[in-house]
C-alpha cells in the first residue's frame, strides 16, 4: 500500500534527523530561546514555498511570542504564476545577488536577535544575502 510506504519513508527521515541532527536542533533552540528571553526577536525569512513556515510562525492568539516574520511580498506565493509578477520575476528576484541586503535595510536588528532562514535548496542568493547580513 502506497500510504504505508510513504509513512515508512517519513519515519526513516525522522529517525535519520534524530540520529544526525538532534544536537544541532538543540543548539538552534537554545539560541532562539536566549533571544526571546532577552526580550529580543527570532526573525524568520523564506521565499517561495519556504514562506509557509514563516507565515505559520506569525504571532497570533495562542502562539509563541518572540518570532518576527520577514515577509517580502514579491517572494511569496501571493503573486500570480504567469503575467504580472509571475514565476519568471519571482525566480529572478530570489536569485538576484544583493536583493537580500536591500530587504534587510528595512529592519533594525540587535546583537541579541537571531534569524531563522527557511530554504529548500540553500543556494538562492536572497537567502544567502539575508544570512550574511544577519551574521
Each PLM stretch: what is its role?
Residues 14-24, 115-124:
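Short, glycine-rich nucleotide/cofactor-binding loops
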Residues 37, 44-135:
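Glycine-rich phosphate-binding loops that contact phosphosugars or nucleotide phosphates
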Residues 1-20:
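Generic N-terminal amphipathic, Lys/Arg-enriched alpha-helix
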Residues 20-37, 103:
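A short, well-structured juxtamembrane/interface segment
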Amino acid at each position: 500500500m502506497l500510504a504505508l510506504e510513504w509513512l515508512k519513508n517519513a519515519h526513516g527521515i525522522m529517525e535519520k534527523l534524530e540520529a544526525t541532527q538532534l544536537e544541532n536542533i538543540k543548539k538552534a533552540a537554545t539560541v532562539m530561546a536566549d533571544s526571546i528571553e532577552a526580550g529580543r526577536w527570532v526573525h524568520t525569512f523564506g521565499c517561495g514555498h519556504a514562506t509557509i513556515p514563516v507565515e505559520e510562525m506569525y504571532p497570533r492568539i495562542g502562539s509563541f511570542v518572540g518570532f518576527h516574520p520577514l515577509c517580502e511580498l514579491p517572494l511569496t506565493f501571493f503573486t500570480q504564476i504567469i503575467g504580472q509578477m509571475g514565476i519568471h520575476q519571482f525566480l529572478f528576484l530570489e536569485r538576484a545577488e544583493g536583493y537580500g541586503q536591500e530587504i534587510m535595510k528595512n529592519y533594525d536588528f540587535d546583537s541579541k536577535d537571531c534569524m531563522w532562514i527557511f530554504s529548500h535548496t540553500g543556494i538562492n542568493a536572497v537567502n544567502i544575502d539575508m544570512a550574511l547580513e544577519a551574521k
